[in-house]
């Protein structure tokens, strides 16, 4: 009877008071002893006489068996009539048996209760741990070739016989299509799951270029890269070319030129932070918020200073180079007090905004997230 509820026990039971003896109670709640037939198979449970003559090695009703057996719909591993539990290596294959009942476990299993921080997959057909690439219920997964641990994130399939880089989601499924991160956008082939690395690729009828790290060089990235490529090359000045053509630039002149070079329409002149708003709207940007709450996203163009009051040195503009809670921004700025070659700086956005006195701001974002 159950120690808590007092309910009569039926079915299999692992007696931990006597090692790990597997016992069976029939529908009437009676302990089975002697021979017992189940699903065409005959099993033997120790009788009182056998237990008495075993010198303490058997208890009444203990299943007498060795090796793998199937009983009452479960598979057990028996050694010297004792149920084995946890991870067991049998004939060079790993199996998992429930830590309490001893029943073989199949499918996805978290091994944390068994002392290992990994998720593995045990083939339902034979209970064996699987390795490498596995198609399960129509989804591709990757399991470490040595440990069997389910892998996530970026993975090179070269050790598994394929020349491609793939990405596996948090649930272990292979990722297809766009993968948008806080810093870069990536694309994975819709059929093979291979990451697009380098070259030009047609995606949904539009051509995109990718660098040799798999970063998509879309419109937003080209704006950011305009600034990245000019680090250590520009000196801040509001009175020279303003767009870097003479080695000097200011924030709004740089932003105008960066957006134009990324593929926007021609500008009438190099705008300041007051007049830049119209150029942004005319080139696919929409206003996310004026001084309201927002989560920075890669490619956001932010203008500091109230429109109509931010001309000259009163305003600033920058682009978000990394979104999310740890947002980073890049711009041509006066942060280094006009030191030569240091005008382009990448700084933590929230820190920089507070440094500037939490000024009024406008956030603009491309309406076409994957503008090519």
Where are these regions (language model features)?
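Extracellular adhesion/carbohydrate-binding repeat motifs centered on closely spaced tryptophans
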Residues: 1-222
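Residues that flank catalytic or metal-binding motifs in active/ligand-binding sites
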Residues: 118, 164, 184, 206, ...
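N-terminal capping segments
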Residues: 217-265, 307, 312-316
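...with weaker cross-activation on analogous glycine-rich loops/strands in unrelated enzymes
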Residues: 264-345, 349
């Amino acid at each position: 009877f159950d120690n808590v509820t007092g309910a009569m026990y039926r079915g299999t039971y692992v007696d931990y008071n006597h090692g790990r003896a597997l016992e069976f109670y029939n529908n009437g709640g009676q302990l089975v002893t002697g021979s017992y037939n189940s699903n065409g198979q005959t099993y033997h449970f120790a009788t009182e006489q056998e237990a008495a003559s075993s010198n303490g090695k058997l208890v009444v009703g203990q299943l007498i068996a060795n090796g793998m057996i199937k009983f009452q719909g479960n598979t057990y591993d028996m050694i010297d009539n004792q149920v084995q539990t946890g991870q067991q290596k049998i004939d060079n294959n790993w199996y998992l048996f429930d830590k309490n009942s001893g029943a073989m476990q199949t499918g996805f299993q978290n091994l944390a209760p068994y002392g290992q921080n990994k998720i593995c997959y045990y083939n339902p057909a034979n209970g064996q741990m699987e390795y490498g690439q596995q198609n399960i219920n129509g989804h591709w997964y990757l399991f470490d070739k040595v440990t069997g641990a389910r892998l996530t994130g970026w993975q090179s399939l070269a050790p598994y016989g394929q020349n491609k880089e793939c990405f596996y989601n948090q649930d272990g499924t292979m990722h297809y299509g766009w993968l948008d991160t806080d810093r870069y956008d990536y694309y994975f082939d819709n059929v093979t799951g291979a990451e697009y690395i380098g070259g030009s690729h047609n995606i949904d009828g539009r051509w995109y270029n990718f660098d040799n790290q798999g970063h998509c060089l879309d419109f937003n990235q080209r704006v950011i890269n305009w600034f990245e490529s000019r680090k250590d090359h520009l000196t801040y000045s509001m009175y020279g070319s303003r767009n870097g053509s003479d080695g000097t630039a200011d924030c709004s002149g740089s932003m105008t030129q960066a957006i134009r070079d990324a593929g926007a329409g021609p500008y009438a002149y190099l705008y300041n932070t007051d007049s830049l708003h119209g150029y942004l709207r005319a080139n696919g940007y929409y206003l996310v918020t004026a001084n309201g709450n927002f989560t920075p996203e890669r490619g956001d163009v932010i203008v500091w200073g109230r429109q109509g009051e931010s001309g000259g040195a009163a305003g600033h503009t920058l682009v978000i180079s990394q979104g999310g809670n740890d947002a980073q921004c890049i711009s041509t700025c006066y942060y280094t007090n006009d030191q030569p070659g240091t005008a382009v700086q990448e700084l933590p956005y929230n820190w920089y905004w507070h440094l500037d006195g939490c000024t009024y701001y406008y956030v603009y974002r491309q309406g076409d997230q994957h503008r090519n």
